Amino acid sequence: MSKKTVASLSAADISGKRALVRVDFNVPLDDQGNITDDTRIRAALPTIQDLTQKGAKVILASHFGRPKGVDEKLRLTPVAKRLSELLGQEVVKTDDSIGDEVAAKVAALQNGQVLLLENVRFYKEEEKNDPEFAKKLAANADFYVNDAFGTAHRAHASTEGVTKFLSPSVAGYLVEKELQYLQSAIENPQRPLAAIIGGSKVSSKIGVIETLLEKCDKLIIGGGMIFTFYKARGLNVGKSLVEEDKLELAKSLEAKAKERGVSLLLPTDVVLADNFAPDANSQTVSIDNIPDGWMGLDIGPDSVKVFQEALADTKTVIWNGPMGVFEFDKFAAGTEAIAHTLAEIGKTGTTTIIGGGDSVAAVEKVGLADQMSHISTGGGASLELLEGKVLPGIAALDEA
């Protein structure tokens, strides 16, 4: 799926033209309305700066939170302020995303100026992908750039609908990098390819596990979902989380791995807690010795060694989902050890891809984000791409 990119547009093509750029500025705020993490804003800078340097007039569209209609707390005003600081130029802010005020401010833009539209989700038509709303959004622009990978799995007006009215419709640098890493890892990886899948529920990762069993050489499973596999094997799991309706599925996934010659690794020991709390009493036991009344909240030290050995000779690793309840320091060791392991093997040329969601937070928590080859900015979008699904926001872009 090779898409036309913003890099392929020359200054001659776009100088003086109006670019509608879909970004993902859904950043966290504190109670005072200050941005606590501007990673997503920084991630969009390469695309914005490329367009301004080529003389385009840049119109940015983003969602912010989940408003039901206009919500004063979910205006993009703090984002405009932070973006102005990062770009070193004033960003024009509108109070709406369509209509006369927007048209007037866009008409006044000089080449290289940047304007930020108000939260597109103030209109319910955005998530319904309403063609009339998409047409109004597109009316102020000449061409379209999608640089919001995190919403690419949604067919919304600003991610999919507008492409019907604007040409060219191209991928921004962030989307291009996501596709380059995630797709090549699935379609054409350097082998051995290992996938590490964690998280609490098998049900949310079934699609990914099934797809990866077709593609990878080794599959490592951690997190709460391991107890569904253990119970399916007939082991006692105490009070650990189990999805009773997924026991047969767990058996069939193990059988499928065997049949395909994929090395499927589950932890050999676990760290147990007597209740779900950061200060719970804990003990480490082998998986055959889980007593009643205890629940597993992390993988144990032996499992870490087994996983490290399995990862030592890999050339590509995809990691999605933590090994335990890493929000509790007492049960974070397994997740942190995997992060350190990936940082180490990355130094010897292994491509390490963090596939969105909680694993990103885990890698950032231990300060190793800059040592990974690629950290995906999409949670659901990364998962769907790894599952081999078509993402509407990507499919709608022009072919290269």
UniProtKB/Swiss-Prot annotation:
Chain residues that bind substrate: 24-26, 40, 63-66, 121, 154
Leader sequence residues: none
Catalytic activity: (2R)-3-phosphoglycerate + ATP = (2R)-3-phospho-glyceroyl phosphate + ADP
Pathway(s) this gene product operates in, as recorded in its UniProt entry: Carbohydrate degradation; glycolysis; pyruvate from D-glyceraldehyde 3-phosphate: step 2/5
Binding site for ATP: 205, 296, 327, 356-359
UniProt key word Mitochondrion: no
Molecular functions per Gene Ontology: ADP binding; ATP binding; phosphoglycerate kinase activity
GO biological process terms, semicolon-separated: gluconeogenesis; glycolytic process
Alphabetized Pfam families for the sequence: PGK
Entry-linked SUPFAM superfamilies: Phosphoglycerate kinase
Keyword ATP-binding part of the UniProt annotation: yes
Superkingdom assignment: Bacteria
Cellular component GO terms, alphabetical: cytosol
Cross-referenced HAMAP family: Phosphoglyc_kinase
Sequence similarity: Belongs to the phosphoglycerate kinase family.
Identification of the protein by name: Phosphoglycerate kinase
Organism of origin: Trichormus variabilis (strain ATCC 29413 / PCC 7937)
Organism classification: Bacteria, Bacillati, Cyanobacteriota, Cyanophyceae, Nostocales
